[in-house]
């Protein structure tokens, strides 16, 4: 299952990268993130592996993040893994002009279990809406004066 989203950001690409590249900021635009722990490699660099723990209501879950590509300041790719799916995310930051950057996110889910192969695609709208909310929170954070 694939989808792509775009969001214009009213800041320079360098400012966007600086905010995006700081894992402490991730907790601001992903408020359900409660812990980010790098287990191997250099955080944010290709080959780095981290465990991200989220809490949503009474439910707590973890994802393994593997950084697959980094080209500062225009691209950052990761794969998130759990027992149900691998989720590849390609983030690209394109200069529109000096103070505007377009954030493109290309997402692909590869479902692992039989049940998720059947029901996962029916949840595409939910995945898109959740991603749009996260992107919008990042926009509000990074554009704050």
Predicted regions and their residues:
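Hydrophobic ligand-binding cavity/cleft-lining segments
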Residues: 1-40, 45
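A generic structural signal for beta-strand entry/edge sites
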Residues: 2, 73-75, 98-102
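Short, surface-exposed coil-to-beta transition loops
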Residues: 2-4, 60-64, 86-90
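Short structured motifs
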Residues: 3, 35-37, 75-76, 88-90
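Solvent-exposed residues in well-ordered beta-strands and their adjoining turns
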Residues: 8-12, 53-57, 68, 94-96, ...
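Amphipathic alpha-helical segments that line or abut small-molecule/effector binding pockets
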Residues: 14-17, 132, 136
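Beta-strand/loop substructures that line and gate deep hydrophobic ligand-binding cavities in soluble
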Residues: 81-133
């Amino acid at each position: 299952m694939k989808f792509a989203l775009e969001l214009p950001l009213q800041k320079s690409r360098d400012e966007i990268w600086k905010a995006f590249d700081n894992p402490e900021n991730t907790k601001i635009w992903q408020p359900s993130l409660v812990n980010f722990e790098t287990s191997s490699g250099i955080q944010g660099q290709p080959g780095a592996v981290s465990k991200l723990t989220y809490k949503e209501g009474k439910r707590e879950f973890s994802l393994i993040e593997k950084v697959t590509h980094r080209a500062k300041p225009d691209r950052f790719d990761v794969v998130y893994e759990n027992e149900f799916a691998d989720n590849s995310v390609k983030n690209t930051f394109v200069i529109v002009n000096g103070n505007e950057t377009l954030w493109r996110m290309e997402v692909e889910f590869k479902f692992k279990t039989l049940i998720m192969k059947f029901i996962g695609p029916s949840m595409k709208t939910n995945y898109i809406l959740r991603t749009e909310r996260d992107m919008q929170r990042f926009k509000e954070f990074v554009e704050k004066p």
